[in-house]
């Protein structure tokens, strides 16, 4: 454990309290943190090294080096170094600024003060000076300086409360408690200074919810777990003081261990652009070779005789060597086909798009003051190409606000409402709820409409009392009183809050807890139970239990959990009650309610003592501790007596149905990945409109092994494609072209809508290598896919499967810690700021408060970003090919001498001054249709999914367009200058006038072209386009003026040329002719295309223009209700760890789903919906609505 290799050799950590000398021999990290990358001395070399690792920067650096060689450079060094230095400087300033703030943050944290026990005295020390093994005193509302073993606190039994918002985003308080042997130390400094315990524990890791260790002190060993540890980043709350021993410091703390780098994501356009840039480099080399060969031929055939003004010694250099030098010269001249400004412009545009998302008030959730946040600036255009959405349910599609609705106790349902004829009826506003106002500590917002439960409580039904007693005892809720004396519950899951609140209103009030006791008020009587054991929840157990001793001395085990798990633990005598309760659970799940089973067991005192002794031994074990504890839990949680079941409601979020429908019309497939049971998952599908009664079939895959799963998948495919048509070949399509062909086959083959439901157990087999192809083929042919009972790992595996084999852009959206792996795996990760903390938000690329904002994020911001980026790239490549290839044509008329056409300053400023701002304005602000029409017509989204706006074909069209423009730019002026004289009779066919004419023509042509490309004009577009032209002429006349020539005669030799040339009418005629010849074919083509073959976007633009002239009153969409048959389902899923229980069971009400945004459930047809939307009483709109074959 010594020297630099200690991390590799450390297998366990040994820490001795109050002994720095002992701990220093292990060379543990100190408490100083470093998140900064540079210092004053290392910034320049490290930053330059990082920047030149980028291929583009390294490429331009190589060009700069070539330009420093006089024999091959026709351009001076500043033509490359000016833009390169500009880019390098901008990036360096940005990196330096970011690192300055990191330094500032590091210093602020490292210089925080803590009271440290040194030499038997408490001394104020900076955090960075704290060492492993030190004992620290914390006071209320202080941040925790390092990962501490809690020794004692001001609260009884060594309890303390911490807020972990900086770790996991959760603002609710969590309880930690010290060992009883150390809690006795209290605040006695002398006893704390004499504490010399030795902790042997796990090595530093990033697991926030797990800790294993042993404290050896006074000849005895004590087991340590996560409840004894306070982590760095926590804040001490509601506790006057506490003392802790430093276990991990600085970079070894769990907070810093979790601050690893996020996986870098690149867009499909980035990957395509990298490929195209390589192609351009190849094209550039080919041009260089052609011109080099031309130079060699010219030198050998013409150069030797070309001696009128040039004199050199014969045989001084060979034609081949001349061609070699010319090759490199033209590589330098033609490098502007990929200017360095391209990469800077792309980042600026993406930054602008990110700000638009952050500033969008329509994605601002005013109830909680939560705006939409683009947490990355590199993925915006990818939002316009999404094909698959993978969504969590609870807290994402639903509100994750739980309400206790129904329960089954001893075979009887409570919570139903009956009429005078004892017939079950709907709950209406006229129905009076149970009056809880007489109970002073009741929750005023709680409502329950069945009065029979209160009657059973008053009559003293023992089963009802035991049921409510269990709800008040078996949980992880913390209680406190506010300033008004009201009882407040700190809950870690909304489910537990709903159950404990229900028990509270029915007279069984949870009051307080300590590590050894739980106090509740039972119908007015205060009762304290001794807490003997807490059997925590995890994803395998799917249940939690507490073992308590009541005042009469009886030992009880109370348990709640998933019915499938708990029913297996029941005593055989429960058979009749089990049947009744199962029926009730099916009924609850059919109504979309989240369910839990409730059971208990009476324990013999002798048996419990023997079991508890084994549990203590297992907790003290250093090997296989978890396995031994799990076995003991299984042993005691058996022969349970069933009490009943609970049913909690979780409503859909506002706007979910409309959003799902709209995204489906945009050809986006939504897969729900939930921890719910199968029936509940089906129910949420119906509630969200993803499943309908009109579907041809819903395939349910529930095989118990790989063979059964494979057979079910293949049988489903046979049903889908037909018995006599063997479509599948067992292979998954990977290329986009093949995928489009596959889609066309499916359209011909599948005549209806299908859905796939698969549970987690079957999914585990379906994800095996020999079955996953069948799963993926079937799933991708279905309109809806719902995976239920899935683990966080399976969620990520499903996303990776589609990413890898479908070549499709994926998006994952969720709100909880169990969604983090899925969010990180997808191309785009979206976090919902919900009830389950901020883990998902912190791991996401984009975040907002409501699922409905996903519609605007994709259909508006995503589509616009893709549209703008594609137009930007098309124009940028066109502009630079038109600009650069003029040199190629000129080479044939200048003896392939690598002479440039333009002035060197024009070459330097063309991309960074003359044409940079207009294209940026278009890339940031342009839009084809308004945001409202983007939402109302989801089919506008499809071009992005099919990569229609920028692909290899579009690139070649841009290249050909640029080549044509370069031909016009060169040959029209060349032909005009071939034999021409000015108005004064003087010959004007000089090189300088020719260069000025071509440069002016180029600036005007590309400005006119961007004006034609701009669909949405703003004040900024006008200023940038006309301003750029004005800047060009201002700089041109300045550089050609007598004044600048007098100061820099060598750099600006074209004195007076601009004034002389641009005062000639024939020059302006040439410029006009060049401009018209360049843009008229484009104007003609676009006019014919829009008139004869309009896209959907073209038609919507026509409609927008017509709407400005005649704006008819908007009509509301028809509202319909769907009645559905009862579908049963249960829900249960938790996050692992103490107190994070019952947080991902997922249900929804299937009958009469609640209104969302004024729309309960609307049946849309993709064609008729768009037609109805766009029929607006004008001829243009009428023709649009009648055109049912929309060309994308």
Swiss-Prot record:
All ranges on the Cytoplasmic side of the membrane: 1-44, 93-276, 350-871, 925-954, 1014-1019, 1086-1192
List the subcellular locations: Cell membrane; Golgi apparatus
GO molecular-function term, one example from the UniProt record:
magnesium ion binding
Q: What class of enzyme is it?
A: translocase
Q: Report the active site residues.
A: 392 (4-aspartylphosphate intermediate)
Q: Which PROSITE patterns match?
A: ATPASE_E1_E2
Which tissues and organs express this gene's product? Ubiquitously expressed at moderate levels.
User: GO cellular component terms?
Assistant: Golgi apparatus; phospholipid-translocating ATPase complex; plasma membrane; specific granule membrane; tertiary granule membrane; trans-Golgi network
- Enumerate the Gene3D superfamilies for this protein: Calcium-transporting ATPase, cytoplasmic domain N (3.40.1110.10), Calcium-transporting ATPase, cytoplasmic transduction domain A (2.70.150.10), HAD superfamily/HAD-like (3.40.50.1000)
Bias kind Basic residues: ranges: 1104-1125
Q: Which CDD domains match?
A: P-type_ATPase_APLT_Dnf-like
Please give the biological process terms from Gene Ontology that the record holds: Golgi organization; phospholipid translocation
Disordered: annotated segments: 1104-1130, 1143-1163
Member of which family? Belongs to the cation transport ATPase (P-type) (TC 3.A.3) family. Type IV subfamily.
Task: Tell me how this protein assembles.
Answer: Component of a P4-ATPase flippase complex which consists of a catalytic alpha subunit and an accessory beta subunit. Interacts with beta subunits TMEM30A and TMEM30B.
Full protein name: Probable phospholipid-transporting ATPase IM
Q: Which organism is it from?
A: Homo sapiens
């Amino acid at each position: 454990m010594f020297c630099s290799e200690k991390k590799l050799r450390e297998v366990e950590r040994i820490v001795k309290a109050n002994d720095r000398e002992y701990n220093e021999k292990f060379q543990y990290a100190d408490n100083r943190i470093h998140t900064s990358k540079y210092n004053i001395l290392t910034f320049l070399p490290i930053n330059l090294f990082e920047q030149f690792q980028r291929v583009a920067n390294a490429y331009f650096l190589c060009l700069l080096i070539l330009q420093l060689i006089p024999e091959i450079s026709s351009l001076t060094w500043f033509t490359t170094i000016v833009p390169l230095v500009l880019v390098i400087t901008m990036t360096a300033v940005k990196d330096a600024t970011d690192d300055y703030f990191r330094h500032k943050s590091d210093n602020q944290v490292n210089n925080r003060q803590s009271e440290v026990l040194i030499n038997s005295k408490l001394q104020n020390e900076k955090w960075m000076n704290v060492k492993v093994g030190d004992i620290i005193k914390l006071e209320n509302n202080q941040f925790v300086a390092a990962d501490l073993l809690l020794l004692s606190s001001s609260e009884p039994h060594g309890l303390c409360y911490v807020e972990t918002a900086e770790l996991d985003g959760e603002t609710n308080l969590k309880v930690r408690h010290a060992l009883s042997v150390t809690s006795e130390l209290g605040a006695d400094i002398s006893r704390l200074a004499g504490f010399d315990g030795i902790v042997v524990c796990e090595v530093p890791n990033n697991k926030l919810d797990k800790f294993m260790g042993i404290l050896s002190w006074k000849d005895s060993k004590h087991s340590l777990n996560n409840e004894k540890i306070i982590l760095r980043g926590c804040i001490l709350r509601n506790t006057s003081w506490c003392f802790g021993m430093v276990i991990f410091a600085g970079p070894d703390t769990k907070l810093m261990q979790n601050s690893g780098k996020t996986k870098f994501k690149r867009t499909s356009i980035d990957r395509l652009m990298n490929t195209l840039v390589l192609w351009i480099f190849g094209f550039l080399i080919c041009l260089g070779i052609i011109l080099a060969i031309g130079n060699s031929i010219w030198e050998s055939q013409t150069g030797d005789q070309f001696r009128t003004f040039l004199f050199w010694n014969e045989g001084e250099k060979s034609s081949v060597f001349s061609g070699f030098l010319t090759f490199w010269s033209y590589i330098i001249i033609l490098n502007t086909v990929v200017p360095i400004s391209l990469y800077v412009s792309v980042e600026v545009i993406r930054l602008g798009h990110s700000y638009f998302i952050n500033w969008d008030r329509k994605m601002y959730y005013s109830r909680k003051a939560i705006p939409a946040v683009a947490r990355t600036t590199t993925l915006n255009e990818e939002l316009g190409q999404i094909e698959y959405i993978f969504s969590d349910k609870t807290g994402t599609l639903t509100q994750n606000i739980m309400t206790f609705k129904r329960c089954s106790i001893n075979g009887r349902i409570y919570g139903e409402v009956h009429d005078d004829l004892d017939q079950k009826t709907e709950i209406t506003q006229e129905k009076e709820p149970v009056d809880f106002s007489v109970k002073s500590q009741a929750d005023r917002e709680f409502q329950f409409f069945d009065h029979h439960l209160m009657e059973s409580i008053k009559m003293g039904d023992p089963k009802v009392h035991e049921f409510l007693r269990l709800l008040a005892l078996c949980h992880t809720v913390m209680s406190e009183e506010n300033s008004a004396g009201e009882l407040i519950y700190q809950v870690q899951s909304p489910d537990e809050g709903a159950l404990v609140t229900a028990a509270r209103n029915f007279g069984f009030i949870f009051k307080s807890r300590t590590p050894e006791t739980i106090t509740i008020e039972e119908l007015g009587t205060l009762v304290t139970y001794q807490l003997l054991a807490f059997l925590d929840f995890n994803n395998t157990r799917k249940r939690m239990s507490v073992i308590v001793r009541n005042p009469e001395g009886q030992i009880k085990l109370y348990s709640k959990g998933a019915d499938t798990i708990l029913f297996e633990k029941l005593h055989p005598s429960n058979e009749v009650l089990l049947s009744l309760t199962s029926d009730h659970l099916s009924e609850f799940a059919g109504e979309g309610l989240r369910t839990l089973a409730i059971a208990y067991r009476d324990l013999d005192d002798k048996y419990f003592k023997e079991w508890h002794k084994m549990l203590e031994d297992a907790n003290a074990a250093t090997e296989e501790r978890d396995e031994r504890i799990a076995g003991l839990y299984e042993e005691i949680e058996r022969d349970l007596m069933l009490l009943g079941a609970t049913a909690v409601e979780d409503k859909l979020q506002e706007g979910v149905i409309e959003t799902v429908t709209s995204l489906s019309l945009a050809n986006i497939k939504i897969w729900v990945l939930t921890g719910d049971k199968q029936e509940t998952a089906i129910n949420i599908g119906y509630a969200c409109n993803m499943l309908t009664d009109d579907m041809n079939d819903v395939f349910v895959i529930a095989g118990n092994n790989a063979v059964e799963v494979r057979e079910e998948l293949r049988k489903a495919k046979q049903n889908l494609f037909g018995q006599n048509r063997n479509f599948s070949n067992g292979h998954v399509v990977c290329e986009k072209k093949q995928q489009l062909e596959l889609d066309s086959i499916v359209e011909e083959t599948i005549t209806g809508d299908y859905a796939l439901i698969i549970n987690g157990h079957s999914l585990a087999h379906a994800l095996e290598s020999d079955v996953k192809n069948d799963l993926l083929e079937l799933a991708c042919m279905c309109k809806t896919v719902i995976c239920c009972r899935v683990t966080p790992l399976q969620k990520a595996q499903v996303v990776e499967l589609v990413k890898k084999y479908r070549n499709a852009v994926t998006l994952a959206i969720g709100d909880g810690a169990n969604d983090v792996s899925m969010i990180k795996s997808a191309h785009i990760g979206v976090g919902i700021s919900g009830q389950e903390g901020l883990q998902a938000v912190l791991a996401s690329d984009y975040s907002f408060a409501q699922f409905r904002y996903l519609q605007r994020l994709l259909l508006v911001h995503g589509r616009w970003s893709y549209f703008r980026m594609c137009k930007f790239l098309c124009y940028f490549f066109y502009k630079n090919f038109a600009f650069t290839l003029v040199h190629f044509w000129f080479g044939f008329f200048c003896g392939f001498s690598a002479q440039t056409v333009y002035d060197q300053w024009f070459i330097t400023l063309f991309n960074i001054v003359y044409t940079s701002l207009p294209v940026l304005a278009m890339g940031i602000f342009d839009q084809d249709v308004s945001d409202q029409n983007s939402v109302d017509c989801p089919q506008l989204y499809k071009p992005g999914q099919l990569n229609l706006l920028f692909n290899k074909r579009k690139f070649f069209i841009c290249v050909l367009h640029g080549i044509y423009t370069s031909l016009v730019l060169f040959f029209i002026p060349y032909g005009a200058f071939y034999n021409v004289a000015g108005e004064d009779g003087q010959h004007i066919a000089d090189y300088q006038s020719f260069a000025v004419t071509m440069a002016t023509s180029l600036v005007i042509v590309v400005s006119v072209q961007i004006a034609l490309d701009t669909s949405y004009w703003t004040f900024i577009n006008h200023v940038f386009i006309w301003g750029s032209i004005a800047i060009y002429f201002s700089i041109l006349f300045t550089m050609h003026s007598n004044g600048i020539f007098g100061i820099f005669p060598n750099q600006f030799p074209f004195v007076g040329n601009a004034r002389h040339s641009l005062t000639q009418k024939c020059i302006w005629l040439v410029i006009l002719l060049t401009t018209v010849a360049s843009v008229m074919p484009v104007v003609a083509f676009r006019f014919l295309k829009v008139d004869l073959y309009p896209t959907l976007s073209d038609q919507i633009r026509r409609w927008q223009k017509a709407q400005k002239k005649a704006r008819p009153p908007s009509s509301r969409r028809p509202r319909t209700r769907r009645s559905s048959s009862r579908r049963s389902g249960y829900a249960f899923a938790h996050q692992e760890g103490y107190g994070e229980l019952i947080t991902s069971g997922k249900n929804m009400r299937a009958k009469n789903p609640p209104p969302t945004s004024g729309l309960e459930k609307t049946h849309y047809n993709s064609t008729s919906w768009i037609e109805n939307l766009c029929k607006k009483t004008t001829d243009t709109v009428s023709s649009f609505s009648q055109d049912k074959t929309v060309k994308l």
